[in-house]
């Protein structure tokens, strides 16, 4: 499954647009990590535990978007976008979406 952030797949012809493919996930922070990350926030530097959490969430959202696109019979997803938001109790939601297409 190919993902692109552009409207077309370079070197390929889109034969059909199948609709929106999407995938999302919600990840919660760990209380123990919050304590160590709070200290890092005071002293400065990357909050690695949070970076890893968001990387995992993005990967999961993209995997779920790919599953959704495959279920529609897609070869690729164009115009891929990722959005994230904080939800209750320190959880983070990441959604991936784009247009599922078939290619010649």
Swiss-Prot record:
It holds the Pfam family YbjQ_1. It comes from the Archaea. Belongs to the UPF0145 family. InterPro entries: UPF0145_dom_sf, UPF0145_YbjQ-like. It comes from Halobacterium salinarum (strain ATCC 700922 / JCM 11081 / NRC-1) (Halobacterium halobium). The lineage of its organism: Archaea, Methanobacteriati, Methanobacteriota, Stenosarchaea group, Halobacteria. This is UPF0145 protein VNG_2432C.
């Amino acid at each position: 499954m190919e993902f692109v952030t552009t409207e077309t797949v370079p070197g390929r012809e889109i034969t059909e647009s199948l609709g929106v493919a999407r995938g999302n996930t919600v990840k919660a922070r760990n209380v123990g990590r919050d304590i160590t990350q709070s200290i890092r926030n005071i002293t400065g530097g990357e909050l690695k535990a949070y970076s890893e959490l968001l990387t995992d969430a993005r990967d999961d959202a993209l995997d779920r978007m790919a599953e959704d696109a495959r279920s529609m019979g897609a070869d690729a997803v164009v115009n891929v976008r990722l959005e994230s938001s904080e939800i209750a109790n320190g959880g983070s939601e990441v959604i991936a979406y784009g247009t599922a297409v078939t290619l010649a």
